[in-house]
């Protein structure tokens, strides 16, 4: 795992997916299929927006979008993309939600946060998402799926230079989190986490592995066409991530 993906405290930040990656397209497609998640009357907050990919794709389907991230590495790229594509209802803000959210100064109708919760210092900081969501708002998050054969975020394993060892993610939690760069979840674990922090889970599904890590070619085309075709799967072993849609519990 490249060193630039860690901050000064050696905390793993991850690498954002590109706007053309299949995983991004699948996430947005699933949100569009969920009744009334998108709408030009809704304000939208993307927590951990990275390079802004999800925000860009949702911009025409929302009233306004704010993308926030713990670092501003992609701020110039985001602003350049917005200007180039004449998008006027989006903006970026550098915010560490685990420290201070006062600069946001509002609550939002819709929140998205893709592959972010596993990077929080304390997973219970998801309670802050609730503070940022309106009473009748909806939230969509995704987290890495424990039952995918490969460790999606890599690990610092002793004596092993390759950090994506098959089945490492299947180890018991106390062993996995000793070496892994990020937490990993089952449907049960992420549901319990959200419920513990004031959310009601409305929907969860396994996002089919997008095969973005493979080089373009015949093998990738065949895998996507025949084994990893649909946006979701009922087979957890074919899924890299879990998508959850939730609302504030009243």
Question: What are the functions of these language-model segments?
Answer:
Residues 1-106, 110-114, 126, 205-209, ...:
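Conserved N-terminal segment of class I S-adenosyl-L-methionine
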Residues 47, 120-121:
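Short, glycine/acidic-rich beta->alpha junctions
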Residues 45, 132-133:
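Generic leucine side-chain signal with a strong bias for well-ordered alpha-helical environments
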């Amino acid at each position: 795992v490249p060193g630039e993906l860690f901050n000064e405290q050696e905390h793993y930040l991850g690498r954002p997916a590109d706007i053309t990656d299949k995983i991004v397209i699948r996430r947005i497609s699933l949100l569009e299929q969920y009744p009334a998640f998108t709408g030009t009357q809704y304000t939208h907050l993307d927590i951990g927006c990275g390079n802004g990919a999800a925000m860009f794709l949702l911009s025409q389907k929302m009233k306004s979008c704010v993308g926030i991230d713990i670092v501003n590495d992609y701020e110039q790229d985001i602003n350049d993309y917005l200007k180039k594509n004449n998008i006027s209802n989006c903006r970026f803000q550098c915010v560490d939600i685990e420290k201070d959210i006062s600069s946001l100064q509002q609550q939002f109708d819709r929140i998205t946060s893709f592959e972010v919760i596993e990077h929080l210092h304390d997973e219970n900081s998801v309670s802050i998402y609730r503070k940022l969501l309106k009473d009748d708002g909806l939230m969509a998050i995704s987290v890495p799926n424990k039952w995918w054969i490969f460790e999606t975020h890599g690990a610092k394993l002793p004596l092993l230079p390759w950090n994506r060892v098959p089945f490492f993610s299947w180890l018991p939690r106390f062993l996995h989190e000793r070496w892994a760069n990020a937490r990993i979840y089952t449907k049960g674990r992420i549901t319990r986490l959200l419920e513990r922090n004031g959310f009601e889970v409305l929907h969860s599904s396994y996002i089919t592995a997008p095969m973005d890590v493979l080089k373009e070619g015949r093998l990738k085309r065949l895998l996507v066409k025949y084994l990893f075709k649909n946006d979701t799967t009922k087979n957890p072993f074919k899924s890299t991530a879990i998508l959850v849609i939730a609302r504030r519990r009243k």
